[in-house]
Amino acid sequence: MSWQDYVDNQLLASQCVTKACIAGHDGNIWAQSSGFEVTKEELSKLISGFDQQDGLTSNGVTLAGQRYIYLSGTDRVVRAKLGRSGVHCMKTTQAVIVSIYEDPVQPQQAASVVEKLGDYLITCGY
């Protein structure tokens, strides 16, 4: 399965995620949904935020030019929200899964889809 297949068939097909991308820890995008124009700089800031959440707390999470309010996170997961949209991201051994979800999808629904894929990638060494 290609990286694009993971985005299309695992994340978007769940209908719990409306936009998504998978990138390496260097910020290079491996696959992304159509119209989700997240930049390498935005991804780099997000990735550094997994280890140092202070930057996300003060500056929020910016994806595709949209700034989201940082809600919570760990060294593996980052959550953010803006109005009716939410962000759920997961860091694996070599990759970061970034997802956007929209109302009426609940945060737990998006989290379940993203983390299931993330856990699978970890078992595969990614």
From Swiss-Prot:
Keywords: Actin-binding, Cytoplasm, Cytoskeleton. GO terms for biological process: actin filament organization; actin filament polymerization; actomyosin contractile ring assembly; brain development; cell morphogenesis; dorsal closure; histoblast morphogenesis; larval central nervous system remodeling. InterPro entries: PFN, PFN_euk, PFN_sf, Profilin_CS. GO terms for molecular function: actin monomer binding. SMART domains: PROF (SM00392). Expressed in ovary and head. Disruption phenotype: RNAi-mediated knockdown in the neurons of adult males significantly reduces survival to 27 percent. Adult survival begins to decrease from approximately day 9 post eclosion. Pan-neuronal or glutamatergic neuron-specific RNAi-mediated knockdown decreases adult climbing behavior. Glutamatergic neuron-specific RNAi-mediated knockdown also decreases activity throughout the day (during both light and dark cycles). SUPFAM superfamilies: Profilin (actin-binding protein) (SSF55770). It is found in: Cytoplasm, Cytoskeleton. GO terms for cellular component: cell cortex; cytoplasm; cytoskeleton; neuron projection; perinuclear region of cytoplasm. PANTHER family: PROFILIN (PTHR11604:SF0). Belongs to the profilin family. Occurs in many kinds of cells as a complex with monomeric actin in a 1:1 ratio. Binds to actin and affects the structure of the cytoskeleton. At high concentrations, profilin prevents the polymerization of actin, whereas it enhances it at low concentrations. By binding to PIP2, it may inhibit the formation of IP3 and DG. This profilin is required for intercellular cytoplasm transport during Drosophila oogenesis. Function in neurons is essential for adult survival, and is important for climbing behavior and activity. This is Profilin.
